[in-house]
Design a protein with these regions (language model features):
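Bacterial Sec signal peptide processing site at the extreme N-terminus
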Residues: 17-34
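Outer-membrane beta-barrel "beta-signal"
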Residues: 19-21, 231, 274, 382-384, ...
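C-terminal outer-membrane beta-barrel translocator/porin domains of Gram-negative envelope proteins
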Residues: 26, 213-222, 226-351
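Short loop/turn motifs that connect adjacent beta-strands in outer-membrane beta-barrel proteins
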Residues: 34-43, 69-77, 102-104, 130-136, ...
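Gram-negative/organellar outer-membrane beta-barrel architecture
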Residues: 38-40, 44, 52-219, 225, ...
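Residues that define the transmembrane beta-barrel architecture of outer-membrane proteins
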Residues: 42-44, 56-60, 89-93, 117-121, ...
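Membrane-embedded beta-strand positions in outer-membrane beta-barrel channels/transporters
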Residues: 45, 61-63, 78, 94, ...
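Membrane-embedded beta-strand positions of outer-membrane beta-barrel proteins
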Residues: 46-48, 79-83, 109-111, 137-141, ...
Length: 413
């Protein structure tokens, strides 16, 4: 629930934040470094937390967030300890940290443990300080258990009546090394590993996945291992990595998973993604669009390794993993409109509204695509930006199962 907390954190800057000056010696590394002044400006934000998602339901609690500013008066460190309650998971205690020592270097961590089923331990680092900024390293380590996971079946027309619940216990890593070729091109080599266990879910009243489906029907239902290597080619003219307002982006990716290297099955992923950003009126209005084609080829591919739609970054009218099959097509279109910019407690926040349309479908093969299977999800997003690094959002999408509300970090694309 740290995503929900993040947006509420930004909102609370207008309500309950206070600013203090703390000697830098009292804030040792990695909280501060030589980019901070002395004393350090710290904005403290205590606030209640209320969050909702289609799969998890309602979560409530409280947090205190600390925003540490560097000598350029930018938020360079954020810490957010939190405690919350959800009827499915009990009490969860967590701490989230984000550190931005350089524009080309950042790391994040999250430590969360619930009294029932759920836990979330993550560490992420991005560093592009090697080879004069041409070499980019990304590392993501995780151990996560989500007791709210859902499975409805394969193909586009899976009815809601087939809904099942399970706990997805996922431990693994994702590594990549990218090298810039010229100004706009990058080649990326990646390595990914995950060990997935499927256990009894935490949501009462919804059947357990293995009570309705078998391993023959749903490969990976008893757990699986994936060890994959990938190669990507990227072309980008974006003017910023996290919050672009101008430019285009294209990526082609091939990923291979093989039994000989420890995977549960032999299969391949192919994906093509294109997105663009067109600004108007000095970027007060930004038209953002994305198109994706994803395909999975192989036999007995674990269900969580197939092509998946649904959730906060794809079809926002549905919960995560709502549609699963061999491939999918996806189109996202939204108009990001900056309503106002407001400075409170020496922190400047941009507030945006973003009407959007998500259109997509899963299918057995591209040749079997049918217009009647396309999901049309209109919706509205509200975003708050504390530049250059903090982006919180609430997106409300509408699908055939009813409305879905997502609260998260960063833009959906």
């Amino acid at each position: 629930m740290r995503c929900a907390s993040y947006l509420l954190l930004v909102s609370a800057l207008f309500l309950s934040a206070c600013t203090s000056m703390v000697p830098r010696k009292d804030l040792p590394s990695p909280l501060t470094d030589k980019s901070f002044g002395d004393p350090v400006k710290v904005v403290t934000v205590p606030l209640p937390v209320i969050a909702s998602s289609p799969n998890e339901g309602i979560t409530s609690g409280a947090l205190t967030a600390f925003l540490l500013h560097n000598d350029k008066d930018e938020v360079s460190t954020l810490l957010a300890p939190q405690i919350n309650y959800n009827q499915n998971f009990g009490v969860t205690t967590s701490i989230y940290g984000a550190f931005y020592p350089l524009p080309s270097r950042s790391w994040e961590l999250n430590l969360a443990q619930a009294t029932r089923k759920n836990f979330d331990y993550e560490f992420k680092i991005r560093d592009k300080t090697f080879k004069e900024g041409k070499l980019e390293l990304n590392v993501f380590l995780s151990a996560i258990a989500d007791g709210s996971s859902r499975f409805f079946g394969f193909q586009a027309r899976t009815p809601r009546q087939q809904e099942t619940n399970y706990t997805d216990q996922d431990i693994g890593f994702n590594l990549s090394v990218g090298y810039d070729i010229g100004r706009h091109y990058q080649v990326i080599f990646g390595e990914r590993y995950r060990d997935v266990g499927i256990h009894m879910g935490a949501v009462r009243g919804i059947p357990f996945i293995r009570d309705r489906f078998s391993e023959a029907q749903v490969p990976g239902i008893n757990g699986f291992t994936a060890h994959a290597q990938r190669l990507s080619f990227v072309y980008s003219t974006l003017n910023a990595k996290d919050a672009p307002t101008f430019g285009g982006y294209a990526r082609a990716t091939v990923e291979n998973s093989a039994k000989v290297l420890g995977s549960s099955a032999d299969y391949r992923h192919y994906e093509i993604e294109m997105k663009g950003f067109i600004p108007f009126d000095d970027a007060r209005y930004v038209t953002a669009f994305r198109g994706v084609y994803n395909q999975t080829l192989g036999n007995s591919v674990p269900f969580l390794e197939q092509s998946i739609l649904g959730g906060e970054n794809t079809l926002r009218g549905y919960g995560r993993n709502r549609f699963i099959d061999n491939c999918y097509v996806l189109l996202n279109l939204e108009e990001r409109i900056r309503l106002f910019r407001w400075e409170v407690f020496n922190v400047t926040a941009d507030w945006e509204v973003a009407p959007f349309i998500d259109l997509g479908s899963v299918m057995r093969s591209f040749g079997s695509a049918a217009s009647r299977d396309l999901e049309f999800n209109p919706g509205l997003g509200v975003r708050a930006l504390v530049r250059p690094n903090i982006i919180g959002r609430v997106d409300v999408g509408f699908g055939k199962d009813g409305p879905a509300v997502f609260v998260g970090l960063g833009y959906p694309f």
